[in-house]
């Protein structure tokens, strides 16, 4: 089976490799061509124009930065989607997903959303959580392909529902870490043994695994290996902030986290791992 895969960044590349491992014929496009080199060495077909990459395959998967990038790549040359299925896997707003559905269907194609939750390591090992928005018939037909990315493939509901759920979950990522970073900064400033702090935290209902995962980065202030770049986290929080405003959800907590991320970007931490927000919460003396 031929699959077009558009977007081979931090998450897209390991996800594309999962499809190659499953012996699918992969037709790849990325706006930065150098990010396709490893896939090319493993027999993926590389294209310099998205319309060429999607010409033959009946199934198209996008893992691009945001809605604007998706629109630019898919529609810049009036590509024909007749008889094709598009699986959109990026984190975008529900309304943006519905707009894509409308445009793809107007062109004779089929659209589903399938955002994922997990790290680059989980993308490599095929342990992502895949949230799917489409009708039941389409979900059952495409579930086998989506299981290449993770065994947990969940039908959330119609298009828009999975995108909304992804935003709800992504809101927790910087919120949890900001709270942890704040407590960690206070513990350090008070001269309390960090090992004691972590020992008690791990034994409590307050603990989240991400605390231990990001603790070494924070203590060393080493954020160069970006599992999730801070600029992308801010992109998601901006979407979440807008969605909460539009859906009668108090935004005070999100505003605080958003301000921390904005300050992080202004401190030239955009391309660092999002745990670099620690530098804003606990500035170096």
Residue locations for each model-derived region?
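Hydrophobic beta-strand scaffold residues
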Residues: 26, 46, 111-112, 153, ...
């Amino acid at each position: 089976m031929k699959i077009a895969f558009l977007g081979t960044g931090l998450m897209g590349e390991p996800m594309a490799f999962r499809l190659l491992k499953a012996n699918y014929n992969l037709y790849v496009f990325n706006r930065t061509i150098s990010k396709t080199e490893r896939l090319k060495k493993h027999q993926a077909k590389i294209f310099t124009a998205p319309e060429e990459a999607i010409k033959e395959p009946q199934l198209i998967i996008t893992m691009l930065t945001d809605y604007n990038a998706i629109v630019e790549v898919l529609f810049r040359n009036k590509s024909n989607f007749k008889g094709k299925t598009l699986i959109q896997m990026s984190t975008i707003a529900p309304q943006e997903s519905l707009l894509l559905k409308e445009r793809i269907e107007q062109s004779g194609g089929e659209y589903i959303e399938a955002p994922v939750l997990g790290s680059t390591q989980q993308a490599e090992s095929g342990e992502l959580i895949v949230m799917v928005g489409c009708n039941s018939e389409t979900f059952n037909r495409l579930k086998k392909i989506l299981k290449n990315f993770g065994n947990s493939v969940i039908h959330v509901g119609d298009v828009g529902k999975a995108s909304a759920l992804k935003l709800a979950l992504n809101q927790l990522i910087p919120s949890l870490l900001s709270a942890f970073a704040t407590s960690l900064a206070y513990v350090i400033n008070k001269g309390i043994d960090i090992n004691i702090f972590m020992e008690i935290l791990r034994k409590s209902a307050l603990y989240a695994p991400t605390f231990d995962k990001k603790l070494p980065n924070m203590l060393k202030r080493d954020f160069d290996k970006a599992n999730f770049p801070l600029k992308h986290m801010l992109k998601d929080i901006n979407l979440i902030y807008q969605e909460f405003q539009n859906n009668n959800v108090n935004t005070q907590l999100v505003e605080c986290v958003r301000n921390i991320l904005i300050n992080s970007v202004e401190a030239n931490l955009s391309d660092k791992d999002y745990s670099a927000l620690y530098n804003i919460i606990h500035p170096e003396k």
